[in-house]
Amino acid sequence: MTASYLPSILVPLVGILLPAVTMASLFLYIERDEIL
C-alpha cells in the first residue's frame, strides 16, 4: 500500500497547522476588534 505513510505525515501536520491557523485567526480577530 503506497498510502500507508500518509497518516503518519498528515496527523502531525494537522495537529500543528490547525491550532496555528485557529490561534492566528483568533488573534487577528481580537486585534481588529480592539482597533475598531
From Swiss-Prot:
One GO biological process this protein is involved in is: photosynthesis
Mainly localized where?
plastid
Give the superkingdom in one word.
Eukaryota
This one is known as Photosystem I reaction center subunit VIII
- Output the Gene Ontology cellular-component terms: chloroplast thylakoid membrane; photosystem I
Q: Which organism is it from?
A: Adiantum capillus-veneris
Q: What role does it play? A: May help in the organization of the PsaL subunit.
Tell where it localizes: Plastid, Chloroplast thylakoid membrane
Keyword Kinase tagged: no
Highest classification ranks of the organism? Eukaryota, Viridiplantae, Streptophyta, Embryophyta, Tracheophyta
UniProt keyword list: Chloroplast, Membrane, Photosynthesis, Photosystem I, Plastid, Thylakoid, Transmembrane, Transmembrane helix
Amino-acid biosynthesis in keyword set: no
Tell me where the transmembrane regions lie: 7-29
The way it spans or sits in the membrane comes to: Single-pass membrane protein
Q: Which family does it belong to?
A: Belongs to the PsaI family.
Q: Which HAMAP family match?
A: PSI_PsaI (MF_00431)
